[in-house]
Curated annotation (Swiss-Prot):
This is RNA-binding protein YlxQ. The keyword Chloroplast does not apply. It holds the Pfam family Ribosomal_L7Ae. It comes from Bacillus subtilis (strain 168). The lineage of its organism: Bacteria, Bacillati, Bacillota, Bacilli, Bacillales. One of its GO terms (cellular component) is ribonucleoprotein complex. Keywords: RNA-binding. RNA-binding protein that recognizes the K-turn motif present in ribosomal RNA, but also in box C/D and box C'/D' sRNAs.
Amino acid sequence: MSGMEWFPLLGLANRARKVVSGEDLVIKEIRNARAKLVLLTEDASSNTAKKVTDKCNYYKVPYKKVESRAVLGRSIGKEARVVVAVTDQGFANKLISLLD
């Protein structure tokens, strides 16, 4: 489980209702300046990846890539997810430090 220190923290953020999942909802959070960090899977489609990363770059929201959609979904207790946004600055800062 090396390199997966972020896994339980994202689950905790989800239980605290500080995580939004799904492409449309994440883009809405980015536009409304509520997203503090976006997690995107490496197996996301090129169209989805471009759309999300372009929004993050334009609105200056940091984003990180994680292994797969199954891992990301499992970390928040749901089915496979391609993109999630963290809406709390404290959780976002800790996740950034763990993912670097």
